[in-house]
Structure formats: structure tokens, C-alpha cells
Amino acid sequence: MRILIASGGTGGHIAPALAFREELRRRNIPNELLLGGLKVRFPAGDHFEFSAGELNLSGIPKIVKGIFQTFDAVNNADVVVGFGGYPQFPPILNAILNNKSIYLFEPDALPGKSNKFLSPFAQRVFCAFREATKYFKNGIFVGIPVRKLPIIKKEEAMKILKIETSLPVVGIIGGSQGSEFLNGIARFLVSTGKFFVLAVVGKRGENEEGKNYKFVKFFEDISLFYCSSDVIISRAGMSSIGEIAYFKKPALLIPYPYAGGHQVFNALDLYNFGGAEMLLEN
């Protein structure tokens, strides 16, 4: 059996696809990774990139191009697994046309348009949050896939990052694309002089460091970020929530207020289980 993994866009879709692929490789199951519409830099390993457009009139030419680009890969697969978002459309449409077995993964508590549209063609929709299952007749709750990241002592992680401080370390992460709002919180906390702030600022920020702060656009090894931090302030994308739970870190979630408000529902899921505190941006 050969499994084709279709993902792309942002880290919220790519990270669970990589976790799934890691497990397939551990079990020696043949697989291929297709990524489309990449908006972020991500250590994805070997993969094939294809054209993907958003689900509107202007995106149709890119979708059509992506269908042609992914035809052979889909044709050679037995099963196609899509990880949500518009980038999965070209390979999943190919899978429908080629009568392949289709499975989908929904990363948010409030499902997006892509999975809602494609779910009737899928055998199952695997949901990261229980709340999402009620939107699909074939939905099943599976939790959040997280890569097997190394967990090391705080002192060791700080040494690798060349951080020397006796202050509490506040880790701030705004998702794979970064967050200007959370970057502002990072700068404010630095100004108090009461904390060392380790922030993943994404493409909206710059690499910089000082006596009580270190701002990094991107971490190749995100485990160093979590292992160095005493507490986390984060957006509420699925990947961040999964990693916070994996590293067992106390956290304050400030969900991204746009994109249909799906991060609010993600954050509520963890908050209701006592896994984090939550504040709305306003």
C-alpha cells in the first residue's frame, strides 16, 4: 500500500502532515508528500511542490495547473490523505477522478470550507478536536498529531541557544506566519525588565537579541523554544496547542480573531480541559 499525503499553505496544515509521515516511515509504509501553496519556510524533508490556488475565481488557474502536476503521484498511490486547506484541492480532486480511497484531516474545532466541501468523497474525516466531529457525518475524533520532538532540560536548551539569565523565561509564538500583536506583547514584556523573552516572531519580525530577549524568525528545532521556556504565550492554532500539551507547558492562549474565529474554538477546547488560560485579543 502506498499513501500520498497532500498538504501545504501554513504550518497548521504542514505540521500534522509531517507527524503523520513520521509515523508511516516508522512503520515502513511507502509514502509521498505533496506540498502546495507554501506560505512559510518549513523543514519538510523530501517532497514534491505543486501549484495551489485559493477557492475563488482568481485561484482556478492555479488549481487546474496543480491538478496536472499531481496527476502521476495520485495515480501511483492507493490512498490519498488531505490535511485541510485549499492546497489539498488539486490532489484530492485527482483522487476523486481516479477513484482512489480518500481520507481527510481537520485541524480546527471549526472546520474550513475545503474539508466541508470534500468530506462527502472521503471515507473518514479525522478531527483534531471533538467539536469538529459534529460537522461531518463521517467525522471521528483522533486528537492532534505531534512529531516525536526531543525533550531536554531547560539548562541544556538555554545553553544551546546561548541564553544566560536568572529571569523567568517567557516563550512567545505567533504561529508559523508570526503575529504583530504578539510581537508587540514581547516588546512590552522586555521593557518591564522582569522577564527574559524568547519570541518566535515569524516573517513579520526580525532576528535580534539583547540582554533580556532573543527574537527568532524561525526555529529549525522548535523543541529548544519550548524546553527553554517557563511559560508560553501563543496563538491557538492546532500545532501550537498540540506542542504546548506535548511539552506540558503552562500557557496563555490569545487566539487569532479573524479567519472565521476558528482559533477561539481551538483555544476553548484546551481551556475547558484546564490545559491553558485564554484571553481574547480585544
What are the roles of these predicted feature ranges?
Residues 1-200, 204-282:
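Nucleotide-activated sugar donor-binding and catalytic core shared by glycosyltransferases
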